[in-house]
Amino acid sequence: MKKMLLTAIVCLISALASGSDGTGVLGERVCKDVKPFSALNISNCCNVVYEQGDEYKVRVVAEKALLDSIADIADCKVVGGMLVVSVKNVNAGFLSSLERVDFKHGEVFVNGVPYVRVRKEVTVYVTAPNINRFLCQGNGSLRVDKMDADNVEFFVSDAGSLRADKMDTDNVEFFVSGAGSVDIKQLNANDATFHVSCSGSGLVDVRCTGTLLCNVSGAGSIEFSGTAAKFDKIVSGCGSVCCSELRCSDKKVMGKNKACSEGERLVFGDVE
């Protein structure tokens, strides 16, 4: 039995070693006939960059060898006004969901897909005038360089992650659960609400002219810096809120668990 297992492992290593080797040279594929959408759903092992623009456009950037081998490397479709994006698990070399290795015409196939050793991750660039709802789940990763919107919602779950450089919005609401994470360099908003549960986490620099509301439960944690006219927090379970770098003009901290968490210091004064 041990001998058979060892033989199988050796065959597997040999098969993967004989797969096509990507050169690192990037190529691009544009998804055709993309219908208008106002919501974005990211799943699977998918890296997505949202670029706000005048047109609706989806383009896939990956190693050229990978694009040549796998015609349908990215699945992009609009359902009920929502763009659903998923990518075949190539960033991890298929090893994370390994089921079978096949040989066809001298090529190696893992889980029925041509195996290519990649050096760079697959990235999907999404362009749209305005998206008001983002869903990031599984191992999905969303990056927002800059966006301007009236009302927007973000749902980050499982091991999903959201990274943003600058957001300008009237009202924004974040739902972070599972092992989801949020990292926002600059958030300018009238009202901002954060719901963080399970082991979700957040790191946010905010400029809030209205109310900043934070609801943390389970083992969730979030850290704020910047300014807010009003700050309201509700903390339960082992959740924690750190706002040692948050300046708030309202001297009354509302909500349950009013006492500051360990290491937390609210600085009160006029918000510039």
Language-model-derived ranges and their functions:
Residues 15, 19-21, 142, 158, ...:
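Compositionally biased regions
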Residues 29-30, 124, 142-143, 162, ...:
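Short, flexible, glycine/charge-rich loop motifs used to bind or transfer phosphoryl groups or to couple energy/partner
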